[in-house]
Amino acid sequence: MGIFGKLFKGPEIDQAKSADSKQKMRRLFDSVVPDGEQYQLVAAYTEDARRFNYGLVHGSKTTYGSLIVGWKEGTDPTVAVVPTVPDLSGCGDPEICPRSTVKKAYRNKYPTDAFIIYPDGKHYLAINTFEWLEDEKLFIYVDQGPEQQAFETFFKTCYATK
């Protein structure tokens, strides 16, 4: 590798830190989801963009939320979504969505590449998965290329409604 290859290589992923995050994700998920050990896991995020218009001043503010997403195949494929924080110090209550009870589930390509699930007619879940994101203040620090691909395949083949 030449000098330019070393200069423009980009950040390296700390695999030990990533493995620690995966263990924390598993512990949190298993603590709040019944039979959590049966699920495969992927870290994800959700975003909420709000626009404002104050006369001459226009803009938007985006807030991000970290998620632990579990999925399991079987006779009734299920997705479980657990809200958490980027450092994985705690989590909220899970939203468990068996395929048989979901109103609609699809992958939205535009404006964001998100997996959208309508567990009922009142609200929806927007799940954005990633291989690795550098900003550990906003996102869970985890290297998860194979897990992301596995979730994408599961969603497309077993879970999506359209």
Mark where each language-model region is.
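Residue-level detector of intrinsically disordered, flexible termini
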Residues: 1, 42-43, 79, 104
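Anionic N-terminal interaction surfaces
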Residues: 2-72
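Terminal and domain-flanking low-complexity segments
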Residues: 3-6, 16, 132-162
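Phosphoinositide-binding peripheral membrane targeting modules
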Residues: 55-119, 124
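A short macromolecule-binding patch
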Residues: 125-130
